[in-house]
Structure formats: structure tokens, C-alpha cells
Amino acid sequence: MITVALPKGRIAEETLDRFEKIFGERFVFEDRKLILERGEFKFLLVRNQDVPTYVLHQAADIGIVGLDVLEEQESDLIRLLDLGIGRCKVVIGSPMGSEIDYSKPQIKIATKMTNIAKKHFAKQALAVDLIKLYGSIELAPLVGLADAIVDIVETGTTMKQNHLKIDEVIMESSAYMVANRNSFYEKKDKILELQRQFSKLKEVRE
């Protein structure tokens, strides 16, 4: 059996839709259930940020998770395939009508992705004070908590509604299929076959 960790929400639905197309049967979680067993697969429904943890500790053999989460957590997992779903961007944003003053001794940046932000600004040789937030990141520069934000956006609509603009795209992200290293060697044939089927389906869709 292969255990698959899925992030709650649209990515889980799109992934299960692909399983249905590949295997010709329904893969649907019962209401409020977090575990789904079907044939040779067991699916776990977890928070997006927790997918790498489940896979890393082999509670799941493979997982579906955003590249932004992988980069933020620097998880030691095998990246099998970019699924091309859940596309989004990690961006720097600041209030409309003003520019970020990079000449300041230190810029205040609000974000929940401190590792990605830290690495990006280190490459730019810029001194930043990273303020860790867990939600409503857009609020920070509007109330003087930060000069700018590093956040994840799909369309940028939420930023515009909060009078923020995108100053720079740090990285583009989409959902990846990843595997635990031990699981990969123990179940290599099955995992590679699943990767092949998903890759084939992706090519058809593109």
C-alpha cells in the first residue's frame, strides 16, 4: 500500500480527480473523514504546511505539496514531478503610491515565509527585520507594522483590494509530488509507475 498525504482544499480535489482518471474509480473522502483507503492507496488529508512533515517521517510515502512550502521548510524529500496545479507566486508587496525605501538601514518585512524572504534579501545584500505573521499579512504595511510584505498570491486581487501592489516576484510555485527517501527505495516500482501515470496525464492536459 502507498500512503499519500494531501493538502486540504482544491489541490486535494484536483489530485484525486487525477487518480480517478488514471485508475477508473472514485476517490472521495467521506464527510469530515481524514483518511481514505481505496485499493492499494491510503490518503491522508492534512494541512498544506504539514505535508512535508508527514512524508519526511514516513507517516506517508508520498505527498502533494506546493513548491513554496518545500522551499520554506527545506525538507529533505525526493521531488518526483511538478503537477502544474495550484499555481501561485511568492511576491514582495507594498502600499500603492509609494516605493520601498531600500536606502533605510533596515527594512521591516512581514511574512509567514521567513526562510524564503531571508534567502532572497540576503542575495540582494539587504538588511531586513523579518516579522513573522500567520495570517492577514496584507494588513502589516497598512498599519505601520512593516514597510512591505512577502506573501503568496494567485491573482493579486486580495492585495489590490487592500491597496497594495506587487513590487517583485521572488518565485513561482505549483504543487509537486514528493516522496520519502526510504519509501522511494522500498516501493520504487510502484512510486515510479504512479509518477509516470501522472506525468502522462499532465502531458495530455497541456
Curated annotation (Swiss-Prot):
Coiled coil: none annotated. The lineage of its organism: Bacteria, Pseudomonadati, Campylobacterota, Epsilonproteobacteria, Campylobacterales. Lacks the C-terminal regulatory region which is replaced by HisZ. InterPro entries: ATP_PRibTrfase_cat, ATP_PRibTrfase_CS, ATP_PRibTrfase_HisG, ATP_PRibTrfase_HisG_short. It comes from Wolinella succinogenes (strain ATCC 29543 / DSM 1740 / CCUG 13145 / JCM 31913 / LMG 7466 / NCTC 11488 / FDC 602W). Heteromultimer composed of HisG and HisZ subunits. NCBIfam families: hisG (TIGR00070). GO terms for cellular component: cytoplasm. CDD domains: PBP2_HisGs. GO terms for biological process: L-histidine biosynthetic process. PANTHER family: ATP PHOSPHORIBOSYLTRANSFERASE, ATP PHOSPHORIBOSYLTRANSFERASE ATP-PRTASE. The keyword Membrane does not apply. Belongs to the ATP phosphoribosyltransferase family. Short subfamily. This is ATP phosphoribosyltransferase. GO terms for molecular function: ATP binding; ATP phosphoribosyltransferase activity. The keyword Amino-acid biosynthesis applies. Gene3D superfamilies: Periplasmic binding protein-like II. It is found in: Cytoplasm. Keywords: Amino-acid biosynthesis, ATP-binding, Cytoplasm, Glycosyltransferase, Histidine biosynthesis, Nucleotide-binding, Transferase. Its main location: cytoplasm.
